[in-house]
């Protein structure tokens, strides 16, 4: 990918859209027909969309540098807050059709604990991702500049560790605290299953996006 402003803006756009959509669909739980601790694994609907954001910051960091990657994270946070406020504002406006309003509330209703969980997990995991990505990258390249071919190391290491932070924080806050599952011993296995299931999915997605990362960061 050429280091141009247009390409950088394109990646910012993909990052922002993926982030906002992930927050819209995060309340949906996907049932996976795999048993873990006697429970079906349940995945928040945001898992796939949100995984794209880590790929975008990694590409930005590799091509444009750490500063631009951090700028992307900060603008992403602002986008999340603005999107949430606009959804809440629109939700409060009087509706012509009551039934349509109920459908709207069901689809886009903002549970405050989900918002807190999402913002907390986002800021912590994305900041860690950028930090670790460049920490490992700089250390490996300092030994030998030709090690750029090994960029799968810092790409996967940063994403896979940051996804642990994101998964534990979001599920712990949104479902553990929000639904009160942390204080219900019967739901502990469900929480653990959600964490493990979601992380395994993110782990697989992180591994699968490696060829895309190489393609987008290759030097012609």
Residue ranges and their predicted role:
Residues 144-157, 164-171, 176, 186-220:
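Alpha-helical transmembrane segments and their cytosolic interface
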Residues 4-5, 103-108, 144-149, 183-188:
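Helix-boundary and loop/linker segments of multi-pass membrane transporters
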Residues 16-32:
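Alpha-helical transmembrane segments of multi-pass membrane proteins
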Residues 1-14:
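N-terminal membrane topogenic signal
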Residues 89-113:
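Membrane-interface interhelical connector segments
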Residues 30-31, 89-97, 173-181:
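Membrane-helix interface motif
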Residues 48-59:
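Central hydrophobic cores of alpha-helical transmembrane segments in multi-pass inner-membrane proteins
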Residues 80-97, 122-130, 163:
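Transmembrane alpha-helix/helix-exit interface in multi-pass inner-membrane proteins
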């Amino acid at each position: 990918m050429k280091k141009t402003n247009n390409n950088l803006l394109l990646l910012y756009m993909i990052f922002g859209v993926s982030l906002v959509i992930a927050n819209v669909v995060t309340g949906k739980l996907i049932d996976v027909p795999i048993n873990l601790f006697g429970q079906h694994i349940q995945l928040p609907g945001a898992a796939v969309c949100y995984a794209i954001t880590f790929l975008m910051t990694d590409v930005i960091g590799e091509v444009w540098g750490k500063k631009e990657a951090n700028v992307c994270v900060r603008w992403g946070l602002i986008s999340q807050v603005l999107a949430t406020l606009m959804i809440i504002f629109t939700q409060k406006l009087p509706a012509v059709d009551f039934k349509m309003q109920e459908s709207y509330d069901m689809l886009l209703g903002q549970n405050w604990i989900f918002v807190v969980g999402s913002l907390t997990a986002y800021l912590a995991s994305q900041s860690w991702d950028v930090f670790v990505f460049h920490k490992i990258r700089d250390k490996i390249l300092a030994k030998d500049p030709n090690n750029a071919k090994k960029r799968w190391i810092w790409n996967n290491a940063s994403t896979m560790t940051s996804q642990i932070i994101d998964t534990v924080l979001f599920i712990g806050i949104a479902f553990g605290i929000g639904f009160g599952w942390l204080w219900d011993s019967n739901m502990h296995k469900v929480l653990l299953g959600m964490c493990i299931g979601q992380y395994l999915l993110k782990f697989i997605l992180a591994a699968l996006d490696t060829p895309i990362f190489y393609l987008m960061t290759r030097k012609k």
